[in-house]
Amino acid sequence: MTVLSFTLMVNQFYLTRGFRLIEGKGRMSYIVKAHRLFGYISVGFLLFHPLLEVLPRQFEGSIQPFDAFWKIITTDNSAILLGIAGWAVMLTLAVTSVLRKRLFKNYRKWRTFHGILAVVLITVVGYHVLVLGRHSSLAMKAFYAVLLAGGYVTMIKTYVFDLRREEKWKNRGLKLAEDSSSP
């Protein structure tokens, strides 16, 4: 389940207006709804990932769940520590997405904040998965790396394109629709 959720999360980069191949395939509102739905599903499963690592220990008889949890949070393994940090970033991303209209009056500021958090999240969690991925073969890890690289390119293109477009509109003396308070 975590493999599917991680893949869904990385694919969120491709369910944005920055990914030009999808833009012409349907109305943007449908793409945003799919982005939101897949985001909630993947975040929902991944927030329970630590519990799913610890709880089965109850039935194995070797180590108790609390001892397993304590071992995880007191480790010095950088990949596990980045997994914990990624969990906190993911929780922040989820909460700010749900409370977006209360926290941000300007849609562009929220979108930029959301994009930066998403890149931080995927970088941190990507390292965690590539180093610790028990269920991933070398081919699967290569697939993840390609998806991550494509996601980064999509984000860079989106924000570079937005900067160019904003400059073009400013030169014409016009205001972008995204600069208004409504999304």
UniProtKB/Swiss-Prot annotation:
Organism encoding this protein: Archaeoglobus fulgidus (strain ATCC 49558 / DSM 4304 / JCM 9628 / NBRC 100126 / VC-16)
Pfam families: Ferric_reduct (PF01794)
Topology of the protein relative to the lipid bilayer: Multi-pass membrane protein
Name of the protein in question: Uncharacterized protein AF_1462
Keywords from the named record: Cell membrane, Membrane, Transmembrane, Transmembrane helix
Transmembrane segments: 37-59, 79-98, 110-132, 142-161
Organism classification: Archaea, Methanobacteriati, Methanobacteriota, Archaeoglobi, Archaeoglobales
Compartment(s): Cell membrane
Highest taxon of the lineage: Archaea
Major location category of this protein: membrane
GO cellular component, one term: plasma membrane
